[in-house]
């Protein structure tokens, strides 16, 4: 079974969000199950030179884009037993950032066409083409509408994964007409048209044989108006080919037993070493070294989606408790400035690191006691899974993948691995934080809760089995 992942980013090459983690980890897990996965992505100038040096020029072809042919170099390399193809074109991919350019519609129209034009030259018979998010959604659409009659492509099945419905790739109609050479028959509400523009993600949803969302709850949520980003009706229409498969974490990267970034490695039976990580974290940030004061942390993009309006509303009430708070992330200036002001107002309790630091993030996961993730919506979420693996108990809102992976602690049965609240309400969140702090001070309960969190399986194994089953069903 041969699968080709078409992605716009992938660890270890380049990363801007969770898509890169999925693209980097899932193929390795599928390989263990006997599924051959190869990955195709743009050859961005941002890719570290040592990784590009590990690739060789496999082939040079021309890609038809509207009225002109564009250069396409196919570079081939291998990392961790997985074969990668990098699509080389400096005009489109020699940029200082992955996305956010005036010509993104053209850039990813080119990449979508390039993926399809490359397939006969890869020395790899593709059974299933698996595209991800808006950037490669049109690969599946163009395959069905323009390439499927060609004997080289007619057997290929398609899967499309929605990682975040909020970002859809909406562009002026000229992109469809001039670059993708699609006529008026595609510019209506049953096809690519979207409020006077063209919507790439819509194309992926319509044309793919199967669609997955990155958690079962998110799969249900996006069929409702509140979460559906104006595509809820379309997703209800194609509900029969929509499924939800929760993401995992790469346990070769996120594992407190082997993590070289943390001060002391530990497992569920050596939690005293977790306390050493807590002390190291307090020293790093210049916080008082108080073993019995819980550290509440957030490692996040500082955006509205992450529920920061709730945090902002009740932050001073949380500060009335004997807690320490560490924020690591960057994003909207209003949230950055708020947390910097809180660090100024509460210098003995609040520390903020604006930006991202991979090594420090690992130490925050290892050294914290509680991990706050009160998202407005969360397709899957990676932070809560990492926190659980490190025995840092998550406090989450019951949405998307947070609802699927965090079970609220039940004091009657002792079951659960975290704390959760339902409504997007600041005082509901505050009540849940206070409840978590209360149980933190009951050491026997807390130790049991931490052990339960750490002994569950958050790897990609179950997810990979589900994807293998999905691929197999398409080929039967």
Curated annotation (Swiss-Prot):
Pfam family, one: Glyco_transf_5
Superkingdom as given in the UniProt entry: Bacteria
Similarity remark: Belongs to the glycosyltransferase 1 family. Bacterial/plant glycogen synthase subfamily.
Disulphide-bridged cysteine pairs: none
CDD domains: GT5_Glycogen_synthase_DULL1-like
Protein residues bound to ADP-alpha-D-glucose: 15
Pathway: Glycan biosynthesis; glycogen biosynthesis
InterPro entries membership: Glyco_trans_1, GS/SS, Starch_synth_cat_dom
Name of the molecule in the record: Glycogen synthase
GO molecular function: alpha-1,4-glucan glucosyltransferase (ADP-glucose donor) activity; alpha-1,4-glucan glucosyltransferase (UDP-glucose donor) activity
GO biological process, one term: glycogen biosynthetic process
Organism listed in the record: Bacillus anthracis
């Amino acid at each position: 079974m041969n699968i080709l992942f078409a992605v716009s980013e992938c660890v270890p090459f380049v990363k801007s969000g969770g898509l890169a983690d999925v693209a980097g980890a899932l193929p390795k897990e599928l390989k263990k199950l006997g599924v051959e996965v190869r990955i195709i992505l743009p050859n961005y100038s941002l890719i570290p030179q040592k990784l590009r040096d590990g690739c060789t020029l496999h082939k040079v072809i021309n890609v038809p884009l509207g009225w002109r042919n564009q250069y396409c170099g196919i570079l081939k390399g291998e990392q961790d037993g997985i074969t990668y193809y990098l699509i080389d074109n400096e005009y489109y991919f020699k940029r200082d950032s992955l996305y956010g350019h005036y010509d993104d519609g053209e850039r990813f129209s080119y990449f979508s066409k390039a993926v399809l034009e490359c397939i006969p030259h890869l020395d790899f018979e593709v059974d299933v083409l698996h595209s991800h998010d808006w950037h490669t959604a049109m690969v599946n659409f163009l395959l069905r509408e323009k390439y499927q009659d060609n004997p080289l492509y007619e057997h290929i099945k398609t899967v499309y994964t929605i990682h975040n419905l909020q970002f859809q790739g909406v562009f002026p109609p000229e992109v469809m007409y001039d670059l993708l050479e699609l006529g008026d028959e595609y510019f209506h509400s049953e096809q690519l048209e979207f409020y006077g523009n063209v919507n790439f993600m819509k194309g992926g949803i319509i044309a793919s044989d199967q669609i997955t969302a990155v958690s079962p709850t998110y799969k249900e949520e996006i069929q409702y108006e509140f979460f559906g980003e104006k595509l809820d009706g379309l997703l209800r229409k194609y509900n029969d080919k929509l499924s939800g498969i929760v993401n995992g974490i790469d346990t070769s990267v996120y594992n407190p037993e082997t993590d070289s970034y943390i001060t002391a490695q530990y497992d569920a039976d050596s939690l005293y070493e977790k306390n050493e990580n807590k002390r190291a974290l307090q020293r790093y940030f210049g916080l008082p070294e108080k073993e019995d004061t819980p550290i509440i942390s957030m490692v996040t993009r500082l955006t509205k989606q992450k529920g920061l309006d709730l945090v902002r509303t009740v932050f001073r009430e949380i500060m009335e408790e004997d807690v320490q708070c560490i924020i690591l992330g960057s994003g909207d200036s209003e949230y950055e400035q708020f947390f910097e002001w809180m660090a100024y107002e509460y210098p003995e309790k609040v520390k903020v690191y604006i930006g991202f630091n991979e090594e420090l993030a690992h130490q925050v996961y290892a050294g914290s006691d509680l991990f706050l993730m009160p998202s407005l919506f969360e397709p899957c979420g990676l932070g809560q899974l990492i926190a659980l693996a490190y025995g840092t108990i998550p406090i989450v809102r019951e949405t998307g993948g947070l609802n699927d992976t965090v079970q609220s602690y039940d004091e009657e049965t002792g079951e659960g691995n975290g704390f959760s609240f339902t409504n997007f309400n600041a005082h509901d969140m505050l009540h849940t934080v206070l409840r978590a702090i209360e149980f933190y001070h009951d050491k026997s309960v807390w130790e049991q809760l931490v052990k339960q969190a750490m002994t569950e399986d958050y790897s990609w194994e179950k997810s990979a089995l589900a994807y293998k089953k999905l691929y197999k069903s398409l080929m039967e």
